[in-house]
Amino acid sequence: YKAYEQNKQLIEDDLRNKIPLVRDIYARYQNRCQQAGAMDFDDLLLQTNLLFRDHPDVLEKYRDYFQYVLVDEYQDTNFAQHLIVKRLCEGRGNLCVVGDDAQSIYSFRGANIDNILQFKQLYPGCQIFKLERNYRSTQNIVNAANSLIRKNTAQIPKQVYSEKEEGSKLQVLSSYSDYEEAYAVAARVHEMRRQMPYADMAV
């Protein structure tokens, strides 16, 4: 996004350098959007940032309108989203974000985990409230998750715990493919049906 905001020529370069079919499809898609007066999600983020950057009066209007900002799933925000939030909240401190750096799974879609990891540096004076009690899982499951998360090289340190019982020991299923995994789970469910009804099982 940084590069696209600074140089609109990049969009044309992207079109020219793609294989012909993809280039043509994307060009038609962009034309259709323009004809319909529509924007997709990425367009909304890009154009909002350009609007706020190039028209300070518009930015100020929205800063006055959105005096308090709450962002959920902050670990999954991308650079453009981070910049919109920063522009809206800069200098005011009326920002609350909720997120878990251990649950960032959308980097393939452009999510930038640094948005949450560096939040304290980006917003000095902020308060961090760690919600470390897990209401859903047994302690054995939580311990296993903690042991894996602890190996993350960049993280916000936390010690998650459960107030539930220790629970059954975990069993690891190693599969060569998603099909093999699905078959193994289905076979286990089929086997367990003798001990309990399907209604008492969860996958």
Where are these regions (language model features)?
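Alpha-helical nucleic-acid-binding subdomain
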Residues: 1-11, 21-22
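Proline-centered turn/helix-capping motifs that create local helix->coil transitions or kinks
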Residues: 1-6, 38, 93, 148-160
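Short linear capping/connector segments at secondary-structure termini
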Residues: 6-12, 65-67, 100-102, 161-168
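Short glycine/proline-rich turn/loop motifs
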Residues: 7-10, 28-30, 126-127
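Conserved helicase NTPase motor core
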Residues: 14-118, 130-137
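Glycine-/small-residue-rich beta-strand-loop submotif within the FAD-binding core of flavoenzymes
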Residues: 121
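Helicase P-loop NTPase motor core
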Residues: 124-127, 132-203
